[in-house]
Amino acid sequence: FYAVTDHAMFLGAVKAAADTTTEFSRLGHVQALHNLNAPENQNFDSIPDRVTAFSTFLPDTLAKVGDGSLDPDVVNQIAKDAWSDTIRAAETFNDPGNFTTFVAYEFTSSTDDRGNLHRNVIFQGADRLPAMPFSRFHSQNPEGLWDWMDGLRQNGIEALAIPHNSNGSNGQMFKLVDWASDPVDDAWARKRIRNEPLVEVTQVKGTSETHPLLSDADEWADFEIMPYRIATTLESEPKGSYAREALLDGLTLAEAGITNAYQFGLVGATDTHVGASSLEEENFFSKVGLLDADGERRGSVPMAPAEAEVIRAAGRVNVQEIAGREYATGAYETWSASGLTGVWAEENTREALYAALRRKEVFATSGPRIKIRLFAGNDYAKDDSLAERYAKGVPMGAELHGADGRAPILVASALRDPSSAALQRLQIIKGWVADGETNEQVYDVACSDGGQVDPETHRCPDNGARVDISDCSITENVGASNLEVIWQDPDHNPEHRAFYYARALENPTCRWSTWDAVKAGVEPRPDLKKTLQERAWSSPIWVMPQS
């Protein structure tokens, strides 16, 4: 399934500026866009002019709307026409049972200090839709988006919003205060979770599950960390920017008698701006076309002096000497070949997929098509069928009640992507509140190659999987095709409010930056990680306290 989520702010405006038959294209400040994609302009030397054309387009257009020299109705009509094109494309290619397409867009607000507040907005159907999408032009405040969505829902138009790139929000995505900096109340919490039942945890601009500074006991927390605010090299504050901490903060809201605003499911996305998914480490092509189309431009391979001069002139990224060689530096080298959303649904239709998104029976992966699943119940048996797992308990995304003091029984499973590395381990991540304090614990629950979890450390033994950095080959015949376990929390306390989600890890493989270096015949850049462990995350299950 697929959703095209174009930016709502100035939707269609660049295309209209490049089309010389439009009234908009005759404005002086858009002339540089006219032939931008002519073959002679699609080369390395064009980068400075391209960067200038795009970086000046937005402020110049806003200025002309502000001073009255550009009628805002012209911009609005362009957006309406582009929105109609988006709807038409989704309708044309929707093929129930085979390929599902959703009408969607991206709400692209941010704080004044560049903290990212972007949301992907997905519509359930296409029969009745607004004339144009709600954008930052309408409100910088995401609460305005929720009000707009509530209004649509009252008129029979159903949609949900998915916060994404929270890692670049500078602590703003998952605050415990509202836009006016007042403590959140129940009405605010209900409105948020009603409109935002999902959160994106991985994409091309890094992974937002958790951060080493927030989860120092999780050895796998330092995974594809993109440390910057979006479109800058300003550091982003981790606290308030990552999903696991938000899940924990949601428990504290519930403990205080407020609706859990952060009782969300986990999904992934690509967020590339090139109309395609760059998901394979070996074949990574990044996100912004000419600016990061090869290893030199995205900082994984040393730059030749002439190329370094062009990059310096563009001003988009820096050039830095590292270990005696010049590399492009900025944010590109921290980006990722990620991610995907998986949905457990009865059929491949808009109705079934959207219902699964709403009930949070969804999962995220960092690129590979790993399938992960989680159930929780009070009376599961080892040989239960899938139907019995649903009948006796709940799937991921749901709440579990009524354990009568017993630890819930969790059934977790993961199936490898046959085109990717084998699975190394299956984990359960638990979060809970005790005595007003939030806590988290990572449990290995299933190990590859016959390994047994150490009951003291809750860790699998090393399965011996290694990577040869010289050619990116990996250890053969190590790892599992599938892992499945029935597990009970050895530290369960029936009085604690808790969540559990599953995480599956592949054997180590080369990161895209190492692949770039191998193909170029150079040593990998020394300050970048050489390998990674691709992974999948289930949505959580929330276990309610007995009291």
Which residues does each predicted region cover?
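C-terminal functional module detector
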Residues: 1-17, 22, 72-75, 87-97, ...
